[in-house]
């Protein structure tokens, strides 16, 4: 409940500041939630790099409160109330505030949890560690696998829970709040065009479902996950929509820099998305200017270049910070198992695109990428060709609704610029599939829809925004209504999930809850400096990753291969989880590590482990390993934590904690 009260108070503080700032600078209040939230994230980022993350949270709260104080002094309470009233009449602002409050209330009641593997390896683990430790996860010695994630989603989460205990549902609500702020910028229309604003907001909200390969009737996690896909799509599209609304004003133009910096800090690929955003803005400043293109070019180049510098600064600062606090080989900027630099990958990829030294793998992936654009489902209408066709129809309507001259050039430049950058991004992913994935994953185009759907979403959102802002008001409103109606109709026809953010999903959390209950018992004994080896016989990695996320300790990686004799480590390799077996031809488990009692003890000593957690045992552990453990082992034993007394102890593993559970 405290999380909810704090979040609602912060929303009230933020929206009040937006209303006052809108009054001061004569801007639409719907435009300001995105730059204000982004500004808060930037402040937290700078303070986090300096090692004072919670000080940054206090600074953000004081800054928002200061806006209220200045507003009350300058405009008097009656003036602030009038500013609130005017802000509430703007559809984008009201929908943002109401939608965000609804999400927080709903999630507080439903308590949704993480469900996807990547949330437990990085995207959910990282914000959890930031909230619990009050510092960036890369500066923390625990669970450093989260260090490859970028900090934006962790920081927006921390903004909404900087002082209290960690809550997964609050993380999910915070990310959705950022997404709604992006939609508010896209739907920032005056009161008299409220219908257009509502339609753009509603259509934009459905876009993550529209550009989705989720099977019909399944659970839709678009607004209930901590992955960076939703923030990436919304920030990319929302930043451009913000620019389309304020870009011609000298001071307000630089508001775009704040969400652009946050976009860059969202994911590694967002460096490319940030540069694409700067390019599209520069293209608009050049081709859609009121003055001749030749005269507009230098100014457009300078402004776009300045935004590109911001992107580069944000991207490089995170890389330098990560390298400084974790000076290991894993933090180097490299691609694939060969450790090639980004430059080498790009040069090699371009050469192969041009036919120079093209490998068979590259040729096969290139053919698969070409076919996937037409055949691989990326939206509710089908493949990428259908997505581009739908977006082009909206762009054509926006062009018709715009005035002749610069407004029409703006729509044309934006759409063609998006198309050009999409082609470049598509080729870039072709190169990544060749260099950054195994042969099997590359040829299968692993996560193809996840990588490209955010671009389609942002492209469509930008075109909807331009359509709603069309000067021919009646035509624009009718066309926007038609586009929103089509999106809604297709969603109802082919994409309505069986469950989503609006419904509970308790059946998805059964295994999570089981591991969580067991981990709670272990955490009464464990502390962050402790190192724990987790064994769960028959696991497919799911339970191991859950424990790695839940335990308040350092979970030690296991091994794969053969380690059946002391001193013979040449046939084993580093892994994460492991199933212990007695021979390499063991067929009971798909993932196995040959291990005997002596080598288990040796491995514990080698990895400096303090504890071993036997989550699930089997006949092999009961038969061969029981003498090592106090009280022995049984194949039906509850999850049990043992303290490692050392390799020379008569009984190396002594009882530390026992957890009961009815779920297996």
Residue ranges and their predicted role:
Residues 522-572, 615-618:
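Short periplasmic/luminal acceptor-recognition loop of GT-C membrane glycosyltransferases, typified by
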């Amino acid at each position: 409940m405290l999380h909810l009260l704090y979040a609602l108070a912060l929303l009230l503080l933020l929206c009040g500041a937006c209303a006052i700032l809108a009054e001061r600078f004569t801007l639409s209040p719907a435009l300001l939630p995105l730059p204000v939230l982004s500004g808060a994230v930037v402040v937290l980022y700078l303070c986090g790099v300096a090692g004072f993350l919670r000080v940054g949270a206090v600074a953000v709260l004081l800054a928002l409160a200061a806006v209220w104080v200045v507003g009350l002094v300058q405009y008097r309470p009656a003036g602030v109330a009038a500013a609130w009233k005017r802000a509430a009449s703007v559809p984008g602002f009201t929908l943002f505030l109401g939608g965000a409050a609804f999400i927080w209330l709903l999630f507080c009641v439903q308590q949704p949890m993480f469900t996807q593997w990547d949330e437990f390896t990085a995207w959910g683990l990282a914000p959890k560690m930031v909230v619990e430790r009050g510092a960036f996860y890369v500066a923390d010695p625990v669970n450093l696998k989260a260090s490859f994630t970028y900090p934006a989603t962790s920081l927006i989460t921390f903004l909404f829970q900087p002082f209290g205990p960690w809550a997964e549902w609050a993380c999910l609500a915070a990310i959705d709040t950022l997404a709604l702020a992006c939609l508010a910028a896209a739907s920032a229309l005056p009161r008299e065009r409220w219908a257009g604003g509502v339609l753009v907001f509603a259509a934009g909200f459905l876009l993550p479902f529209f550009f989705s390969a989720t099977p019909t009737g399944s659970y839709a996690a678009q607004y209930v996950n901590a992955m960076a896909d939703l923030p990436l799509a919304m920030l990319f599209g929302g930043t451009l929509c913000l620019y389309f609304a304020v870009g011609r004003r000298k001071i307000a133009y630089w508001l775009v820099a704040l969400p652009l910096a946050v976009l860059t800090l969202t994911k590694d690929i967002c460096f490319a998305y940030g540069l694409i955003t700067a390019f599209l803005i520069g293209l608009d400043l050049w081709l859609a200017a009121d003055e001749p293109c030749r005269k507009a070019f230098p100014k457009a180049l300078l402004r776009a270049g300045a935004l590109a510098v911001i992107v580069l600064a944000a991207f490089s600062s995170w890389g330098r910070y990560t390298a400084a606090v974790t000076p290991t080989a894993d933090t180097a900027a490299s691609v694939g198992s060969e450790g090639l630099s980004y430059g080498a990958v790009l040069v090699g990829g371009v050469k192969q695109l041009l036919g120079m030294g093209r490998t068979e793998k590259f040729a096969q992936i290139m053919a698969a990428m070409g076919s996937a654009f037409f055949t691989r489902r990326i939206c509710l209408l089908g493949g990428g060709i259908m997505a581009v066709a739908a977006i082009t129809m909206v762009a054509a309507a926006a062009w018709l609704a715009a005035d002749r001259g610069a407004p029409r050039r703006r729509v044309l430049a934006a759409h063609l610029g998006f198309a050009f950058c999409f082609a470049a991004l598509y080729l870039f992913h072709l190169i990544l599939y060749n260099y950054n994935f195994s042969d099997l994953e590359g040829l299968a185009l692993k996560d193809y829809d996840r990588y490209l759907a955010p671009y389609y979403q942002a492209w469509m959102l930008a075109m909807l925004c331009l359509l709603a802002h069309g000067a021919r008001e009646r035509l624009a409103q009718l066309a926007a209504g038609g586009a929103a109606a089509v999106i809604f109709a297709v969603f109802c026809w082919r994409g309505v999930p069986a469950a989503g953010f609006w419904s509970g999903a308790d059946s998805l959390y059964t295994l999570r809850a089981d591991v969580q209950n067991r981990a709670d018992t272990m955490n009464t004994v464990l502390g962050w400096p402790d190192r724990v080896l987790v064994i769960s016989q028959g696991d497919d990695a799911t339970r191991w990753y859950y424990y790695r996320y839940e335990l308040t300790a350092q979970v030690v990686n296991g091994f794969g291969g053969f380690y059946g004799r002391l001193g013979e480590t040449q046939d084993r390799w580093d892994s994460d989880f492991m199933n212990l077996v007695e021979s390499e031809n063991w067929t009971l488990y798909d993932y196995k590590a040959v291990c005997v009692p002596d080598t288990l003890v040796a491995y514990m000593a080698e990895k400096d482990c303090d504890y071993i957690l036997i989550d699930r045992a089997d006949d092999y552990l009961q038969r061969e390993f029981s003498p090592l453990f106090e009280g022995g082992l049984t194949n039906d034993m509850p999850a049990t934590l043992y303290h490692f007394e050392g390799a020379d102890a008569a009984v190396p593993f002594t009882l530390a904690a026992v957890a009961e559970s009815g779920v297996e």
